[in-house]
């Protein structure tokens, strides 16, 4: 109980990551119910009576501003109208900035949902807080029956031997750049450093946000693949922090070099994730690293015809991909796990994955790319490139206290780049704090 209360208190102070990006509001629960023709199961397999279930997610099915919300409503409506059991799913939308804290509070109060959307970076937080339960049996059967699903049971299995969720979309951090400014995207650190000549008094060239705002996420989505490109990693197999390695020092000093050379402007000190994306969209930044979940927002810019994306530059070639994704799990207080699973598996059909692709969410099924409708999409080749680049990395399930760690790493990098601190000393301080907590 002490551990749960501790996690609850911590979660109230934490901003969680959004999803394929973030939703713009935090509305009350919305019930989805409409008429469609798809079916999620065979009536002969329905010995149970239907039940009412709740589904928490950061998207709002009542909103038409976000294409992902529109797809969510369509999928839930179809399930409610056609599932073999007569189940009804009610969506409870929670804004991404309050998602973990509110969900943990609801569960602690005995009002946990039947179905939980959990971002991969925060999955361990849900496991430790007890908001979700193992779904190993369902997951292994599903993966065995669906060879086109991109995730393996082995990679989704946690330290306790259980699988707690299945990713329903993927996103990978890529380099976005202006084709009217650069002939091609840089592939190596040296090539990236050389783009300093494109920076002007009116526009920054390349930008990685170094602010510790939003938990330092802007930095970590580049720091991590660069660290792996240099031969290091954040943690060892036992969960010990090892980013203060020679590779980690090399990355921090390279970031400092980018600022000193003028490749990045000093204003990145105060730029968080959204600041960098907005600057790129407005034309005051010429290149950046950002997740593919931001594609719809990025391409809403008047300059979008000059935007392109590519793998992130690494030490001697493309850096290993930083992969994350939204996942679905069975709530720890689900009234009937079998029924919760019946809804969850409906998310992963080819038809529903095609719908998510139309909303610029990367599919978790390779066979979706074989569909003629998908191949006819204007950005088919780009999205296929994202999917192929994602195979160079793997989804990482970070520890429950990862949010505080990434904030401290961002602060350490700031001290080196802008205050002249020693990179090894700065990283050692954060690693020692983490390993001795």
Q: Where are the regions that the model predicts?
A:
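Long, aromatic- and glycine/proline-rich binding clefts that accommodate carbohydrate-like moieties
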Residues: 310, 358-408, 415
